[in-house]
């Protein structure tokens, strides 16, 4: 679950990281009142769950409450990489002397937390990695031992800071890792982490992603989810316990098991198509869950055909067929649906489809044949 900047900063502040005073606003009038309360120069920052705000004009500096109100009027409603700006963070200005980069993330290759640091903050870390990879310090942390003092000293030495500012930086590194662990994050990124003219180390931005599987023990964070900003298909899938990720293609994908669904995406691409989603109905899915999954996939207006790829182990082929037929009866879906059904009770499932399915339902014996058929039907405009 991705968090807005102001949410991430609130969490980081609880772990001792220094942030600037800020107020969330949803209207230009609220932005003006926030600027009046904060006083002096403020930054008006779009709150969206994506990057590139600065380049898109989503961050403005205002010298007065009136300027803050005008900036808010321009930014609210703006589209930034497909995300509509509905809220702003009005934040006090800072006297910036240096910009650094600091993050903690899960490194799946090493299966350990990874801390990244660079003296080149304020720009995309990918750009830094391409331009000057030697400027990035990478530290793996043993999750059973934690971040050790010598590792903190190594990063502090790499920062080039000295005196009380160096100590402040070391505390920021330690607090960042504690926050990363404490909220079960998969990513905590501060870019930039700035050194002010007074020598203070401050998190000027915060990008935080919390592991969805841990939200049951972080009820407050789970309650921060912005339903309005969420993709409607992904939100509905989460409500009913389906694993769904929206993509940009036109062939809807359903399968049972993450591995099979990933393979299905590959086969559709091999057949020249573009998957519209990842949707895993899971093992043992019953007719109702199958029907709900099909409704969600078909509700994406970009979908022109649906590829239903099921290998029955725990999931029974006859239950899949009943769910598919129930979904079509309930919703009146007229998109072409290509079914590849194998495994437990597959023969019975295919018999049910042959006897009761409408003309828009097609069956194929192999995964590749089914993928080719789904791609062909999508190219024909869904007919």
From Swiss-Prot:
Task: Identify the residues that bind ATP.
Answer: 45, 52-54, 91, 94, 99
| Pathway recorded for this protein | Carbohydrate metabolism; tricarboxylic acid cycle; succinate from succinyl-CoA (ligase route): step 1/1
EC number(s) for this protein? Answer: 6.2.1.5
The entry marks the following residues as binding substrate, namely 256, 313-315
Keyword RNA-binding in the entry? The reply is no
The record lists the catalysed reaction(s) as: succinate + ATP + CoA = succinyl-CoA + ADP + phosphate; GTP + succinate + CoA = succinyl-CoA + GDP + phosphate
Keywords associated with the record:
ATP-binding, Ligase, Magnesium, Metal-binding, Nucleotide-binding, Tricarboxylic acid cycle
For this record, an example GO cellular component is: succinate-CoA ligase complex
One biological process term in Gene Ontology = succinyl-CoA metabolic process
Q: Where does Mg(2+) bind?
A: 191, 205
Question: What GO molecular function terms would the record report?
Answer: ATP binding; magnesium ion binding; succinate-CoA ligase (ADP-forming) activity; succinate-CoA ligase (GDP-forming) activity
Domain ATP-grasp span(s) in chain numbering: 9-236
Is Methyltransferase included in the keywords of this UniProt record? no
Instruction: Please provide an example of a Pfam family that matches this protein in its UniProt record.
Output: Ligase_CoA
- Catalytic EC class: ligase
Task: State the free-text cofactor note.
Answer: Binds 1 Mg(2+) ion per subunit.
Q: Which cofactor does it need?
A: Mg(2+)
Q: What does this protein do?
A: Succinyl-CoA synthetase functions in the citric acid cycle (TCA), coupling the hydrolysis of succinyl-CoA to the synthesis of either ATP or GTP and thus represents the only step of substrate-level phosphorylation in the TCA. The beta subunit provides nucleotide specificity of the enzyme and binds the substrate succinate, while the binding sites for coenzyme A and phosphate are found in the alpha subunit.
The Swiss-Prot or TrEMBL record describes its family as follows: Belongs to the succinate/malate CoA ligase beta subunit family.
- What does the record note on quaternary structure? Heterotetramer of two alpha and two beta subunits.
Its name, as the record gives it, is Succinate--CoA ligase [ADP-forming] subunit beta
Q: Tell me the name of the encoding gene.
A: sucC
């Amino acid at each position: 679950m991705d968090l807005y900047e102001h949410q991430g900063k609130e969490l980081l502040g609880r772990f001792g990281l220094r942030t600037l005073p800020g107020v969330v606003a949803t209207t230009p009038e609220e932005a003006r009142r926030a600027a009046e309360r904060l006083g002096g120069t403020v930054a008006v920052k779009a709150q969206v769950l994506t990057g590139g705000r600065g380049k898109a004009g989503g961050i403005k500096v205002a010298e007065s409450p009136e300027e803050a109100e005008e900036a808010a009027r321009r930014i609210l409603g703006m589209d930034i990489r497909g995300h509509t700006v509905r809220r702003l963070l009005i934040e006090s200005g800072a006297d910036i002397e240096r910009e650094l980069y600091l993050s903690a993330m899960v490194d799946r290759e090493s299966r350990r937390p990874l801390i990244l640091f660079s003296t080149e903050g304020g720009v995309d870390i990918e750009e830094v990695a391409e331009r000057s990879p030697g400027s990035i310090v990478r530290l793996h942390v043993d999750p059973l031992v934690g971040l050790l003092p010598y590792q903190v000293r190594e990063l502090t030495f790499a920062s080039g800071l000295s005196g009380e500012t160096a100590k402040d930086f070391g505390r920021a590194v330690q607090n960042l890792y504690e926050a990363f662990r404490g909220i079960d994050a998969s990513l905590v990124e501060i870019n930039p982490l700035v050194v002010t003219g007074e020598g203070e180390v401050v998190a000027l931005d915060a990008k935080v992603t919390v592991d969805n599987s841990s939200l049951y023990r972080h009820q407050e964070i789970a309650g921060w989810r912005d339903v309005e900003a969420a993709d409607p298909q992904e939100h509905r899938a989460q409500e009913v316990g389906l694993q769904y990720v929206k993509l940009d293609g036109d062939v809807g994908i359903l399968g049972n098991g993450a591995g099979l669904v990933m393979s299905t995406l590959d086969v559709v691409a091999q057949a020249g198509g573009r998957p519209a989603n990842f949707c895993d109905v899971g093992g043992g899915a019953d007719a109702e869950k199958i029907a709900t999954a099909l409704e969600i996939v078909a509700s994406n207006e970009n979908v022109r055909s649906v590829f239903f790829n099921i290998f029955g182990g725990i999931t029974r082929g006859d239950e899949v067929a009943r769910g598919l037929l129930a979904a079509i009866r309930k919703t009146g879906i007229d998109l072409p649906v290509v079914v590849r059904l194998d495994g437990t009770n597959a023969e019975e499932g295919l018999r049910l489809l042959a006897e009761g399915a409408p003309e828009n339902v097609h069956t194929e014996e192999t995964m590749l044949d089914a993928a080719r058929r789904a791609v062909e039907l999508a190219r024909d405009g869904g007919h």
